[in-house]
Amino acid sequence: VPDYTQAISQFVVDSPTSYHAAQAVAARLEKRGFKAVDETVAWDSSIPARGYVIRDGAIAAWCLPSAPSERTGFRIVGAHTDSPALKLKPQGAIVREGWEMINAEIYGGALENSWLDREVGLAGRLTTYDGAVHLVRTGPIARTAQVAPHLDRSAHENLHLDRQAHMLPLTALAGEAVSCHDIENYLCEQAGISPDQLAFHDVFTYLVQPPSVFGLHQEFLASSRLDNLSSVHAGLVALENLAGTENDAAVFVAFDHEEVGSGTRSGAGGPFLQDVLHGLAAVMGFVGDGERALLARSSCISADAGHSVHPNYGQLHDPQVRPLINHGPLLKINARQRYATDAVGGAIWKRACKAAGVPTQDFVSNNSVPCGTTIGPITASRLGITTVDVGIALLSMHSAREMCGVEDGPYLARALHAYWAEN
């Protein structure tokens, strides 16, 4: 557990944005012999049995079976690389009351008050006119300052945050020659490119405070981006430790843009996974109706963080089903299919946990508190394959700094490994 906690903490530090996360996954996989594949060229029999492909902030990796047969299917683990944050707008510097601020908008369902009074950096990707993509990351340069109660007595009872008026981070005292491009110019300097080369950017705030273990028994981990780097890291560890597969193809995919609906070229609602599976099916010799049958023999575990019962808000949870941190990953169920789990998928998950010797817990919502959704229903409906939704339990989901248990990440990694390795 200490080694795993140290590893996921470093993974979070290395992954301030989805683009960095995809590269961090690739770097780890290459150390285990996985080879990069270019999706802009036709795939043929030269595609490596252990390979990966990156599309923007998403990555898909695979381990093909040594002996494909008429029983072969895909065993897929899906997660997502993005988290709520503030995203830099064009002309990203704005002046207010003698302060230089970052002109930003909210990305995803951020718990907005959690971003107040925290030092943040900027990270993401810059594109230049020659088509090159440059990852960039700054140190702590900004802070969204909360108003003092002496100036707003109502803040104690009813904190209201207007996204335009109250959420912009400050970066400096404004000088006489402030340009609306000051932030972009600074990012170019950090990336080592000339500002006149910059064409566009996808840049987000990220919390510079590193993860930390805490608690009376050092059993909790506080960190940014646990939703959903906790699942990405568990899937990565499971794939790193997979020696090989005999019959089924193991596929790991970490999508981007789940927090904003998944409807992009690198999101679960786009064709990324379908494109990868189509290419791998052809490489294994499954074409035409053979590919359809291959998908019919396949399954998917959608791994996305869920909720532990909250000690201060117990009434918001189901009165009977009360999952806790460090008691095993969650099997997520919803009658409206906001989670994709059904009886068949639930059995797949329970069998993997049993094989791994891992405890698992059920999660359902209070009937009066509708739940969110995941990539699970999107994947199931796009591909027509059995899909089950799981994930570790968190408190403070969508906060700038969430918390989980140090036991649950290793549990999830072991269960995912068993799902791939089970004969």
Description of each model-found segment:
Residues 1-423:
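N-terminal hydrophobic/helix-forming segments and targeting peptides
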